[in-house]
Amino acid sequence: MTVPAATKASDCKPGFGCVTNLPLPRFVSLKGDEGNARRGPGLTHRIDWVFLRPGMPLKITAEYEHWRRVEDRDGAGGWVHYSLLSGVRNVIVTLDMAEFRETPDLRSRVLAQAEMGVIARVLECLPDWCRISVEGEKGWVAKTALWGVAADEVIE
């Protein structure tokens, strides 16, 4: 079997995908209503998991041709075709009644709260906080209450 030059391990930079040359791991979101996670990168591989939440954040950990190895916040996952994924940045709230604040400061006024499991759009992130949006509500939430962004990630 011949391996395409773009996927040879020797051609890959550490910490970057061999196919896209984008950082690994990185976060994306589920594009449609459902996405099959397969045991291996191809349609002939068994479906191990089905993601059913539109916009769900997923972590890409590997790439092979048109396939991306992804996992959810619980570590469940598999290989998903890249067309089922979006670069739109979303997070999932991991703390019950996470507080949306007016500014990225614990002394700031609480504008709203979100239940655990809510999926939110990322508007921007600082080292310890992200400004997110859910159903028209916007506010700053501590990163420790979110999954879908790296601890040190800054998003403008």
Question: What are these model-derived regions, one by one?
Answer:
Residues 46-47:
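Beta-strand-rich domains and repeat architectures in extracellular enzymes and scaffolds
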Residues 2-39, 50-54, 61-64, 71-76, ...:
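SH3-family beta-barrel domains
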